[in-house]
Amino acid sequence: MVLCTFQPPKAEAEAPVFDAAVLSLRADIPSQFVWPEEEKPTPDSQEELVVPLIDLGGLVSGHAAVVARSVAAACEQHGFFQVVNHGIDAALIEEAHRCMEAFFGMPLLEKQRAQRRPGESCGYASSFTGRFASRLPWKETLSFRFSPSGDDIVRNYFATILGEEFCHLGEVYQKYCEAMNELSLKIMEVLGMSLGVGRRCFRDFFEGNDSIMRLNYYPPCQKPELTLGTGPHCDPTSLTILHQDHVQGLQVFADGHWRTIRPSSNAFVVNIGDTFMALSNARYKSCLHRAVVNSKVPRKSLAFFLCPGNDRLVRPPAELVDLDHPQAYPDFTWPALLEFTQKHYRSDMKTLDAFTAWINLRIAATGATPE
C-alpha cells in the first residue's frame, strides 16, 4: 500500500488570509478554495438522508432493547443517527450558539489571539490556511480540549488564551462540554448493548476521556458550487455529537449519493468515528461526510468529539473477536492516531487503513508501536 501524505504549503507560496467579513462578499474566490471537479458540491441538492430518531427516554422506560436495535441498524449501515429526549437543557444549547456568534463576529485580529499552532489540534483556525495549500475549507473553527478529570479545563482555556473578558464563554462551554460528556457516556451504554458486550463496557472505557469541542462557522460564499465548508472525511475520533443551527449543510455519502441531514433544534446528530469503528472490530461504520455552504446566510454548528483517555489502548472487546471476525486493526492509542492525522495524513475515508500501514512501517523500522 502506498501511504499518501499531505504536503505543507511551499515557503514561497503566500497563504491566503481567510477573513470571513471580506471573503463572504467577494464575487470570486481565491483558487486555493476551489475544489476539484469530482469533489465539487451540489449545494441545491435536496436529497435527504432520513436517519433513525433515537428516543433516549427509552433507556429508563423499559425499552432499552428497542433503542439498542435501532442504533445497531443505523451503525451497521452508515453510522449516523439522531437522538431526542437527551436531557440537555435547551437554554444551554441556545446560549452556546449565541456565544459562538459572539466569538466569530469579532475582528480577525481578536480571534487570532487563540490562533492554532502548527501540529496542534486546538485553537482558532481560519480555513487551515497554514496547514494545507489547496482544497481549503470555507470555514472558521475554534477547538479546545475537554476532560472530565480536568478541573475547569474549558473555563481556564478561555481565560488564559483569550482573557478574563471571555469568562462567560468559558463558563458556557464548560457546562456544555460537561453535558456532552454525560450524553456521550449514555450513548456508549447503548452502543455496548447493541454490540452485545454489556452496558458498562464502553462507558467504563470512556469515563476518563480526553475529548475535543469544536465551534464551526461557515460564512456565506458567493460561489458555493466551487468550494466546500468541510471536505469529505470520516471523523478519526470515537463519537461525534453535533448540534446544527437552522441552516442545512451536513451531507453524508450513503448508497452512492450525497444526502442531507436536515437540522432539528431539539435533536443531536450522532455519528461513529474511526476510533470506535476499530473498537467495534469494524462491525460499525465510520461514514464519509462533508459540509456545503450557501450564498445567503452563515451556518453554525457545535461538535463534541468523544476520544479515549490518552493512556487507553484501543482494542476491541474479546467478545467481538473470533475466527470469523479476526481483529481488523492493530492496537493503538488515540494520541498516535491524532498525531498521524495532524502531521502525516489529511483525514478521509481511508484514514484507518493508512494509519494501519503507518503503524506497520513504524513497527518494521523500530520494533515498537507508536504511542
Which residues does each PLM region occupy?
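Peripheral, non-catalytic segments flanking oxidoreductase cores
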Residues: 1-371
